[in-house]
């Protein structure tokens, strides 16, 4: 109920057509809460479930945008091509094939570390790293992280998403795919990428039912979720630290939760036109992350469909993430961080009474 209530308020505040949110236990893979709502601007009753009763978190594929950049970075780290402090000379645009890719904000050529590239959500920097990784290895990491296949969570109509075989990529695909366009994922698939990082690099199959209780009150626990290692513990730890920087000083500063360290990433992507090539002027805005970063317990994804106020995930989706994460941490009684939270420090004075 709390997740849906917050999502409704955030969808209304952003004047979005709708929204989706999921909360997952990173230890078990259990989905603790999920919500799908329609906004007041949609051509359906406000705050209703989707008109055709789809659970969009599981059944609808969307282009994730920059939340998917973490997979390119993960692959490059795992292959030993870069480390978090590797420096790249990054311009604000780069031609790949017949398309020019640009960063969201114009800037002079700058020397950025890989951590900076992720924190600033640089398209050019990410594509540069992806080109060194190569399409075959990039595709392998996308699939190992769970893209292109169903999670097999057991929900009817679950989508597998859209991920073309590298043999079918065109000359611009090494630019589009690494930054989360020209692919389609469900919200659950995207959330599970971050849960995998939180879980030390081990992918765990999501579970929506932990146990059943029969008419006589006998409880039967469901089998433990299947697992597989995707990246090393060392790579996962590096990504954890880098994703914290996104929230501390990058595009995700509005995702801060007082008292807790947050790791996560913003995402913004234009929606494809229906039934034909090209893109509309509508956007999907998102934030996906986990907490407490030093001892992850919960992962949360918030996605807003075509927000009418601002388009960027760091502006319109991150605040909803923070509210839902804060509520989930409280309800699950997760202890505050043992290290400094991501709130800026303020000077204060105090008088001692003897």
What kind of feature is each model-predicted range?
Residues 1-19:
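Conserved, well-ordered alpha-helix/loop/beta-strand core segments that scaffold catalytic motifs
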Residues 3, 117, 321:
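A helicase ATPase "motif cassette" and its flanking acidic/Ser/Thr-rich regulatory loops
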Residues 19-66, 71-306, 343-354:
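Beta-lactam-recognizing serine transpeptidase/beta-lactamase-like catalytic domain environment
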Residues 198, 247, 322-329, 333:
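Short amphipathic alpha-helical signal-transduction/dimerization elements
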Residues 203-204, 332, 336:
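Glycine-rich phosphate/pyrophosphate-binding loops
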Residues 307-316:
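A short acidic/glycine-rich loop-to-helix N-cap element
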Residues 335-345:
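Short, flexible loop/turn segments with low-complexity composition
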């Amino acid at each position: 109920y709390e997740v849906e209530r917050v999502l409704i308020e955030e969808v209304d505040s952003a004047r979005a057509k709708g929204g989706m949110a999921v909360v997952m236990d990173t230890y078990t893979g259990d989905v603790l809460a999920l919500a799908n709502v329609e906004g007041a601007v949609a051509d359906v009753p406000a705050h209703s479930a989707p008109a055709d009763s789809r659970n969009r978190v599981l059944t609808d594929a969307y282009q994730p945008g920059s939340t998917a950049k973490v997979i390119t970075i993960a692959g490059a780290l795992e292959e030993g091509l870069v480390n978090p402090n590797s420096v790249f000379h990054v311009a604000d645009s780069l031609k790949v094939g017949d398309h020019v890719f640009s960063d969201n904000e114009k800037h002079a050529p700058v020397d950025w570390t890989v951590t900076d590239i992720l924190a600033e959500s640089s398209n050019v920097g990410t594509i540069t790293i992806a080109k060194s990784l190569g399409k075959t290895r990039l595709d392998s990491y996308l699939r190992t992280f769970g893209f292109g296949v169903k999670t097999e969570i057991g929900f009817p109509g679950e989508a597998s998403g859209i991920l073309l075989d590298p043999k079918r990529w065109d000359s611009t695909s090494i630019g589009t795919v690494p930054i989360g366009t020209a692919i389609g994922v469900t919200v659950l698939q995207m959330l599970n990428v971050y849960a995998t990082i939180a879980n030390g690099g081990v992918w765990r199959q999501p579970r929506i039912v932990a146990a059943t209780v029969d008419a006589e009150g006998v409880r039967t626990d469901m089998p433990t979720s299947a697992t597989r290692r995707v990246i090393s513990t060392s790579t996962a730890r590096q990504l954890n630290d880098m994703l914290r920087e996104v929230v501390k000083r990058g595009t995700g500063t509005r995702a801060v939760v007082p008292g807790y360290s947050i790791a996560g990433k913003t995402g913004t992507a234009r929606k494809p036109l229906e039934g034909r090539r090209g893109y509309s002027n509508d956007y999907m805005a998102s934030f996906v992350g986990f907490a407490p970063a030093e001892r992850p317990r919960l992962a949360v994804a918030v996605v807003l469909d075509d927000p009418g106020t601002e388009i960027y995930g760091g502006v319109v989706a991150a605040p909803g993430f923070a509210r839902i994460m804060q509520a989930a941490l409280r309800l699950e009684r997760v202890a505050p961080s043992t290290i400094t939270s991501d709130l800026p420090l303020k000077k204060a004075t105090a008088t001692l009474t003897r």
